[in-house]
């Protein structure tokens, strides 16, 4: 053993302490995953070495075969995992093994619930595989040297997984990392060749470099123990390069867990090889659950990029649009250069062609999932629906395809579940209906009881109910689907087209003529509060509503702009009244202009509240209402 120098004891970052505690308690039921996680890290270290050695061949230090070795010592109760990858310097070890230098750490910690299954998913997703060693070990030692550093700059890290760790400088002849797990009492099962072999076959068969175990060889009686020989126990070939027919579902699932750092199986995947003008292979996965940082724009996203089976980068963002940022996978190109950079990726026309094809492949995969596994698609929509709604604005070429994948709540159901596709809606449309009607609002309770829906209920016309914050913005980009245009039922002067009979239209015009005087009186009373007053075609039960001008921003968009501190363009609502409602008839007969004004303002404020808006002067509303109540009680 080499002499240790510059030895120091350091404390773990607070988050690491919490994480170690959670690791040991949340993942205990599936403790064998520690080996999968450590092998996955070792594989990444070898990938990084391969890539760095393209420009600095001297890092290979003589060019021994790249591999991972797993060994054990029954007597000492240890399991050792060794790779000859990129290795770590003293600084790397302190940074990577003592702290979690990741954005989103606080969010991650907040999301932990104490529920074992949910937490294990989050922990895996956060990519903290090294700490899983403490599930089975009460002490972990790491011996490492970064490729390119002298042998005298090796490092030894050691911890019992409590509050601190020790780090020292050592001599280490070979580059790479060796991890020694000192097994806890009762975990001796892992110091066994057969058990380790089974775990490797189960979880890490897809790893594209050899994973070796010592050959089991017993000495004959009276003979010396044979020299240690190693044998490869995994396939050691890149999964995406193999024919689809040879790959089992379980292999696809384990590969997903390796690249996505997820503990759950994916919902779906698509494996494809393209030959011809462009040559590349892709393996794309739809996760079962959303990552905790899905809405953080700076969160890592993108595919693993390989060029001719050599790893080039993680999180290559240029191959898929932002609204598909949740997709995990691998793309392996024969056409790109090995020294490709992120900047080059953003400008390369080859990438544009690949992005277009990969985007279509993902959308096809989602269409298939929606058609063949509607229950699974429901789960997908709950997790990723809001992100998919970013699609029509970002990806004009696939707008119709994305629209077909969207799901909405509607007046057809009464639970607010977003399970209606646009194809479902059109299949149920009334004869002669050439529009898709929708209403946006802050909550399902608010929109489903909106007075704007009264005429639609009366005529049995389905209306989509949109309550996500992104919905009004989405609909500004979604103009039509399958040749049918979208109509906001709260906007402009509602025209039901063929769904209104000529008699109904004529009768409405006659009523509007007879109420011209009332229209003028209300307009005078409400003054600058409104842009227009008119007789409503939408109402059957309520006395009045506020409609939005054809070119004006809706309530949702106004609130989003206000919340972000942006200037909101001035706009005034249109006041529509129901001429047959008893309150409007009373208003029409009111002789006192003062009382007429009070009643008009009360109706206006009530219509604003029904639309989900806040009152500009709540005190004035209360004063008028109290005055009216006093008059009624006399």
From Swiss-Prot:
Q: Name the HAMAP family for this protein.
A: HSP90 (MF_00505)
Q: Does the keyword GTP-binding apply?
A: no
Q: What is the lineage of its organism?
A: Bacteria, Pseudomonadati, Pseudomonadota, Gammaproteobacteria, Pseudomonadales
Coarse class of the protein's main subcellular location: cytoplasm
Alphabetical UniProt keywords: ATP-binding, Chaperone, Cytoplasm, Nucleotide-binding, Stress response
Family of the protein in this entry: Belongs to the heat shock protein 90 family.
Q: Name any one Pfam family assigned in the record.
A: HATPase_c_3
Q: How does it assemble?
A: Homodimer.
GO cellular component terms attached to this protein's record? cytoplasm
Q: Where is region (C) located?
A: 560-634
State the species of origin: Pseudomonas fluorescens (strain ATCC BAA-477 / NRRL B-23932 / Pf-5)
Q: What is this protein called?
A: Chaperone protein HtpG
Biological role: Molecular chaperone. Has ATPase activity.
Q: Where is this region: B?
A: 343-559
The record's section on CDD domains has:
HATPase_Hsp90-like
The record's annotation in SUPFAM superfamilies points to: ATPase domain of HSP90 chaperone/DNA topoisomerase II/histidine kinase, HSP90 C-terminal domain, Ribosomal protein S5 domain 2-like
Q: Which domain of life is it from?
A: Bacteria
Q: Name one GO molecular function term.
A: ATP binding
A: where is this region? Answer: 1-342
What are the subcellular locations of this protein?
A: Cytoplasm
């Amino acid at each position: 053993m080499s002499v240790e120098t510059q030895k120091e004891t350091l404390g773990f970052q607070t988050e690491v302490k919490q994480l170690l505690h959670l690791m040991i308690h949340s993942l205990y039921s599936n403790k064998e995953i520690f080996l999968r996680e450590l092998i996955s890290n070792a594989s990444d270290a070898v990938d990084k070495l391969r890539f760095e050695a393209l420009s600095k061949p001297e890092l290979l230090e003589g060019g021994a075969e790249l591999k991972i070795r797993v060994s054990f010592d029954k007597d000492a109760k240890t399991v050792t995992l060794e790779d000859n990858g990129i290795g770590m310097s003293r600084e790397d070890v302190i940074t990577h093994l003592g702290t979690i230098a990741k954005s989103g750490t606080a969010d991650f910690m907040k999301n932990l619930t104490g529920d074992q299954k949910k937490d294990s998913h989050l922990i895996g997703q956060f990519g903290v595989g090294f700490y899983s060693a403490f599930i089975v070990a009460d002490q972990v030692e790491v011996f490492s040297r970064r490729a390119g550093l002298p042998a005298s700059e090796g490092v030894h890290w050691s911890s019992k997984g409590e509050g601190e760790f020790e780090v020292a400088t050592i001599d280490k002849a070979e580059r790479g990392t060796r991890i020694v797990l000192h097994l806890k009492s009762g975990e001796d099962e892992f110091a066994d060749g057969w058990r380790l072999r089974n775990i490797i076959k189960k979880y890490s068969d897809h790893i594209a470099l050899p994973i070796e175990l010592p050959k089991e060889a017993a000495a004959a009686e009276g003979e010396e123990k044979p020299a240690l020989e190693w044998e490869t126990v995994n396939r050691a070939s890149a999964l995406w390069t193999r024919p689809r027919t040879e790959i089992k579902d379980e292999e696809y699932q384990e590969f997903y867990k390796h690249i996505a750092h997820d503990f759950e199986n994916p919902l779906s995947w698509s494996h494809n090889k393209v030959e011809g003008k462009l040559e590349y292979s892709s393996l794309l996965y739809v996760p079962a659950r959303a990552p905790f940082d899905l809405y953080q724009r700076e969160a890592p996203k993108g595919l693993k990029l390989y060029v001719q089976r050599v790893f080039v980068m993680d999180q290559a963002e240029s191959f898929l649009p932002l609204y598909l940022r949740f997709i995990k996978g691998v793309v392996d190109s024969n056409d790109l250069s090995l020294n490709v950079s992120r900047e080059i990726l953003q400008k390369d026309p080859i990438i544009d062609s690949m992005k277009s094809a990969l985007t279509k492949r993902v959308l096809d995969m989602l269409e298939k999932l929606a058609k063949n596994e509607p229950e699974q698609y429901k789960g997908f929509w709950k997790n990723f629906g809001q992100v998919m709604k970013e699609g029509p604005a970002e990806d004009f070429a696939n707008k119709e395809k994305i629209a077909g994948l969207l799901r909405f709540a509607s007046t057809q159901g009464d639970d607010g579940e977003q399970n209606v596709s646009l194809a479902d809606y059109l299949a149920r449309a009334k004869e002669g209906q050439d529009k898709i009607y929708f209403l946006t609002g802050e909550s399902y309770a608010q929109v489903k009881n909106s007075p704007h829906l009264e005429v639609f209920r009366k005529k049995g016309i389905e209306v989509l109910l949109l309550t996500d914050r992104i919905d009004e913005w989405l609909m500004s980009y979604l103009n039509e689907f399958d040749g049918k245009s979208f109509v906001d039922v709260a906007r402009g002067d509602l025209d039901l087209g063929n769904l209104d009979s000529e008699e109904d239209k004529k009768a409405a015009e006659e009523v509007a003529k007879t109420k011209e005087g009332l229209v003028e009186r209300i307009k005078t009373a409400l003054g600058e509060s409104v842009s227009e007053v008119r007789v409503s075609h939408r109402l059957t039960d309520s006395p009045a509503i506020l409609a939005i001008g054809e070119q004006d921003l809706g309530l949702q968009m106004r609130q989003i702009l206000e919340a972000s501190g942006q200037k909101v363009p001035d706009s005034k609502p249109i006041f529509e009244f129901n001429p047959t409602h008893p309150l409007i008839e009373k208003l029409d007969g009111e002789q006192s202009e003062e009382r007429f004004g009070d009643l008009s303002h009360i109706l206006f404020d009530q219509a604003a509240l029904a639309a989900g808006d806040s009152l500009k002067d709540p005190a004035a509303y209360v004063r008028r209402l109290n005055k009216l109540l006093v008059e009624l009680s006399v």
